[in-house]
Structures are given as C-alpha cells and as structure tokens.
C-alpha cells in the first residue's frame, strides 16, 4: 500500500515536556509524482500498483527537467530510499478528488484578466516570482513535494515548533501557546501561524496572508489549516485544508505522507541565485531580445 502505517494503535513518543514528538528529518520524496487532483484515467481506482507509482514518478521527473540535468535529480543520485507513494491524488475532500468549483466572482476576474496579459519578459528581478527568485513558495507551496530538496526538519521546544523546509531554506517558528484571535492589521508573505495540539496531532492555522504567495490563485482571504500526525515510527501524515471563499465555493483538503529519514538524509546549505548565473542570464537574455526587436523595428 502507501508508505503510511496504521494510525489506530500507534502512539508517538513524547518530548520531555509531554508533547507528541515530531522531531527529526523527514522527506516527501515518496510523494513526488502524486497529482493534486484525481485524473480521469484513475477515476475508479483507489490505489496504484507499485509499478504504476514508479512509472508515474519517473514521468514527473522527466517532464520537469527543463534546465536541470537528469543526473542531478535526487532519484538518480540515490538519495531517494522510500518507494513511490501509490496514493492516487492529494485531494481527499471533495471525495471525488477534484478541486471545488471556483466562485462566479473569481471566474469574472480570470476572464477579464487573461485577454489583457501581453507576452512579457522580465525587466527587473521583481518581475519574476518569489519562487523563481528563491525567496519563498508560500505556506502551501513550501510543503509540496518536488523533484529535489524534499527534506523537512522539525525541531520542538516547550511552546514552540520550528519547521524548516530544505527547498529555499524556509523556516517557520510556530507558537503552540494559547493565544487570542488573529488580528487584522498585519498581513505577511507567510501569514500569521497559530499552533495547538489536538491529541497527537499538531494543528497549525494560518491567517493574514498578503496574497502575494498565491497558491492556484488563492487570495489574501485564504485560511490555511495544516495537520501533522505521526502514523508510525517513520511516517507522518500531512493534511492541508484551504478555505478561500473569494476563489472556491467550498473548502478543500489535500494529504500526503512524509517519511522519516534521519539515518542518511542531511539538510545542507541551500543556495540558489546567490551562487549561479540564473538571474543574470534571464535578464540579459531579455535585454538582448529587446535590442533585437528594436533594431528590427528601426530597419522597417
């Protein structure tokens, strides 16, 4: 079946101060390749075979190579020890595995916006997205499995949980102390996170996003709820519930499993545009195209 283990009898270890212990280095490598939504080809399928799951992950790797050599992917280098997940899709609610319908207001925004967006090339670094610039993928995107850098480290102290994602070296420090409701004044890139324990599950509610780390068109009204539950000695179920009435007609839930990999996985220093020529090449190529078009126009 999947990498996850039975949740019914498993009791996670406790920290010295009596909270469920989620600490360690986890990876989402097994979840790489799981589509967000259930495809038509698996409409009546509850689970893939191991062979189908392996082929799906390989397709996902090959389809996302673009500027990266195949040899440098985690699956090629041998970092990936866990078998590919046989989970059909991440969306588990609605039960059909499909995202809810978008709102009429959001459809109107998309319809009015799309025809007016001209082909653009970056003029300055800020014209490129925060993911391209290796700044942030946002609170939803940062947790998602990718073709590499799927490590996740959790560190706990009394009243706090730190979650560090290998991709873009993002770290969130989440208080689990009782707090009053969310204020409305300050909106940030990663929002305001409030944590609490529900039995053995860490529940994190995120509000007050500024809308600039949008996920699938989400707005600053989005409310994100994240649930982390150890389901076995080496597995942790992660659920994310998105409630954005400005975009979707109802909330929806996704889920996948992290696998504990303390023995051989290490989060080393992450460097992106700081140590290569990606941004320089992107901007200089755009300026070269501008110059070529200007020269062609002058010669007409």
Where are the regions that the model predicts?
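PEST-like low-complexity, intrinsically disordered acidic/proline/serine-rich tracts
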Residues: 1-300
